[in-house]
Amino acid sequence: MDIPEGEEDPTFDFQVILVGFSKGCVVLNQIIYELSTVSAGVDPPLNDFASRISAMYWLDGGHSGESNTWITDEKFLDHLAKHVPRIRVHVTPYQIKDATRPWIGKEQKKFVENLRSLGANVKVKVHFQDRDPSLAFHFKLLESF
């Protein structure tokens, strides 16, 4: 947004809530990598944006790759844990109990464990946990979160 010189950005104090669903959680992961540079102070606009993030929601994160669906490296999770007040993880059996992609459930569990060990305010909800993994319930999560 182009703001005339001398005028205040009207969005400056807006809170930012980031939500990723399924493969869209890759974008949240990239933001985590970028946020790790905030403490270095090398990018003032990124610092301003990062300071306004009030919550991040992962909704049934997953992709077709064979690893790195969830970030588990504490080096990157540390900034997230310290600077994002609310971290929420909503998952279904479609992602965390898929026998053909067992790493997703393991990585998700490690992601949450590492954030908790770093002091993050993270909460997890497993939706449809009494159901078999199903693409239908994967999308139904969007109605129930």
Task: Specify the residue positions occupied by each region the protein language model found.
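Serine-dependent carboxylesterase/thioesterase catalytic core
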Residues: 2-85, 96-99
